[in-house]
Amino acid sequence: MAENQYYGTGRRKSSSARVFLKPGSGKIVINQRSLEVYFGRETARMVVNQPLELVDMVTKFDMYITVKGGGISGQAGAIRHGITRALMEYDESLRGELRKAGFVTRDAREVERKKVGLRKARRRPQFSKR
């Protein structure tokens, strides 16, 4: 394998991403596809690039990413978390800046379970007076 490769695992909702950073030109490959092909939505692409733009390293690393589970938003968040962890493995002094932007903390919000007697987690059946 590469002599200087940095790894980070990211999670968000039900998605988990494995991120490998290698010194390069800024190429991003997600599940054998480019960032533009994998994420059609511009917002998801922006979320993925946030940690790199913050520390001015967009063109410094090539990224190989595998991501599983969840939807578009969850996967983008998981990748962002993974990139953040990999950047901290590369240079621990970036932690403060990334922490201030809120990228280091794992977003613990998960889907609330459906309750018996309710239509959804909190949505009650319609009330009828008569």
UniProtKB/Swiss-Prot annotation:
SUPFAM superfamilies cross-referenced by the UniProt entry: Ribosomal protein S5 domain 2-like
GO molecular function: RNA binding; structural constituent of ribosome
InterPro entries, per the entry: Ribosomal_Su5_D2-typ_SF, Ribosomal_uS9, Ribosomal_uS9_bac/plastid, Ribosomal_uS9_CS, Ribsml_uS5_D2-typ_fold_subgr
Alphabetical UniProt keywords: Ribonucleoprotein, Ribosomal protein
One Pfam entry name: Ribosomal_S9
Protein's UniProt keywords contain Secreted: no
Statement: the UniProt record of this protein carries the keyword Ribosomal protein: yes
Origin: domain of life: Bacteria
Gene Ontology biological process terms in this record: translation
Annotated Gene Ontology cellular component terms: cytosolic small ribosomal subunit
Coiled coil regions, renumbered to chain: none
Family the UniProt entry places it in: Belongs to the universal ribosomal protein uS9 family.
Matches recorded under PANTHER family: RIBOSOMAL PROTEIN S9 (PTHR21569), SMALL RIBOSOMAL SUBUNIT PROTEIN US9M (PTHR21569:SF1)
Name listed for the protein in its UniProt record: Small ribosomal subunit protein uS9
